[in-house]
Amino acid sequence: VPLQELSGWHRHPDYARLRADAIREFAADEGIDLADSDTALVFSAHGTPTHYLEAGSRYDVYVEEYCSVQASLLGVSEYEVGYQNHENRDIPWTEPAVEDLVPELDADRVVVEPVSFLHEQSETLSELDVELREEAEAAGLAFHRVPIPHDDDRIAEVLADLVEPFLADFDPGYHQLRQCQ
């Protein structure tokens, strides 16, 4: 069975829209105005050891690019990006660490969007919902975490759209997605 690599799919416009819709709907349900100066929007991305970046990975660039698109879709000009690192390993990780970033925010509330995750897991349910919430509340911030829209029907549609070129034997460049490094 031939193996095809599909990378860069976070750039698919329908995926970007469905994630922005989830943030917008969550904020509306919580009565939060994302443009309010007392609200800080934080995109929390999975961290990576910096030696991968030094070796040529552009992961941090892709995270920044994706967050910029999300902010634009939301009509928000100010936001922060933090990384969930595994600092129990004695190597340098991407910065800033989200747990260092959040307590320093100049806001009354923080809305955290876990941008690197497609489903709920320990890194969202424990690291964000429990540990980061404790850090935020200790700093006097109301904490809100956007649920991952893993059950949104549009995710399956996006994935099908991305896989179809490979199955139909036409150029995967059809989507004009650049390969990630």
Which residues fall in each region the model found?
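Extended amphipathic ligand-handling, pore-lining, and cofactor/metal-binding catalytic surfaces
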Residues: 1-181
